[in-house]
Amino acid sequence: MNTRRPVASLWIGEKLHYLNQLCLKSHVVAGHKTILYCADKVDNAPEGVEVRPASEIMEIDRELVAATSASFLSNVFRYKMIQKTGAIWIDCDAFCHQPFPEDQEYIFGRHGMSGALNCGVVGL
């Protein structure tokens, strides 16, 4: 039985890019249940990635995306998803080179050599 915390992300669009496919698959290979919440029908998710409708977390307002950006909406989605599911948020371009620690409640990705935190990987 897999005891690792699940990881999850959001995709707004119909097709994943090759890099996103590789990165999502890396989490599957590391042993994490990997969920991709989608605003559109996506048919090229890697094997092992569970595709679910983004509406399970929140409705995706296309007018808001058009007026701001998908990134803006993704920021709101990420924290709602963490609150509702307890999964670790991963950006679709975050590669997993080792499983996330099972005994850590808080997980944050680092950015660059300075060690600054970013919101591309977040577990709360």
Label each residue range with its predicted role.
Residues 42-80:
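Active-site-proximal specificity loops/subdomain of glycosyltransferases
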Residues 70-124:
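GT-A fold catalytic core of metal-dependent nucleotide-sugar glycosyltransferases
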Residues 15-29:
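Short, well-formed alpha-helical segments that are part of the catalytic scaffolds
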Residues 19-20, 46, 59-65, 116-122:
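Short, charged, surface-exposed secondary-structure boundary motifs
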Residues 37-43, 94-99:
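Short, polar loop motifs at secondary-structure junctions
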